[in-house]
């Protein structure tokens, strides 16, 4: 009366296997977002949308870019574990970026405009008269391009444009 066992359902075609890759992303691409063609370890190339604000250790999932299904189902996904490369110019602090910028003594004393490098390109930065080494100047909206975007904080480092300047030496000795 109750025998015969349970019927097995045919699960249908199975999805292909997911494939994991580790990828290195340029600091600028992680900050501003980008679309890049990346070569994978197996020789394949994938077009990847890199979202602004991505950090090392996050995983990007590319649907149907993994192994094909052995039973006619959908292909698996490609899982890209991200490693954001360090920048020689900027460091990241959440949504904000930080950098040091050399400013000549004349500009620091009298004030002026200098060029500051941002991940999206160079911008003009106003240096107020009397700026000291270590002063922090803010470039609003020039940090990680999230909503709202972060800021770029520039730490001023005063440098002598000509350390053998006789006028500067005489001024210093006259004190």
Report the location of each language-model feature.
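Short acidic (Asp/Glu) patches
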Residues: 8-10, 43, 86
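Intrinsically disordered, low-complexity linker/assembly segments
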Residues: 49-175
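Post-J-domain flank of DnaJ/Hsp40 co-chaperones
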Residues: 1-38, 70-73, 79
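Short acidic/polar mixed-charge low-complexity motifs
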Residues: 25, 42-46, 121-123
């Amino acid at each position: 009366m109750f025998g015969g066992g349970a019927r097995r359902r045919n699960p249908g075609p199975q999805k292909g296997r997911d494939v994991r890759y580790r990828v290195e992303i340029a600091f600028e691409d992680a900050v501003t977002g980008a679309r890049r063609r990346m070569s994978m370890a197996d020789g394949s190339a994938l077009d990847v949308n890199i979202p602004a604000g991505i950090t090392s250790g996050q995983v990007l999932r590319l649907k149907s870019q993994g192994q094909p299904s052995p039973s006619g189902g959908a292909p698996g996904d490609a899982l890209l574990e991200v490693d954001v490369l360090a920048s020689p110019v900027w460091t990241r602090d959440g949504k904000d970026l930080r950098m040091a910028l050399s400013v000549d003594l004349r500009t620091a004393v009298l004030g002026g405009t200098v060029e500051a490098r941002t991940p999206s390109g160079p911008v003009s930065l106003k240096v107020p008269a009397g700026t000291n080494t270590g002063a922090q100047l803010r470039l609003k909206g020039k940090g990680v391009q999230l909503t709202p975007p972060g800021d770029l904080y520039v730490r001023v480092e005063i440098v002598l444009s000509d350390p053998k300047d006789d006028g500067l030496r005489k001024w210093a000795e006259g004190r």
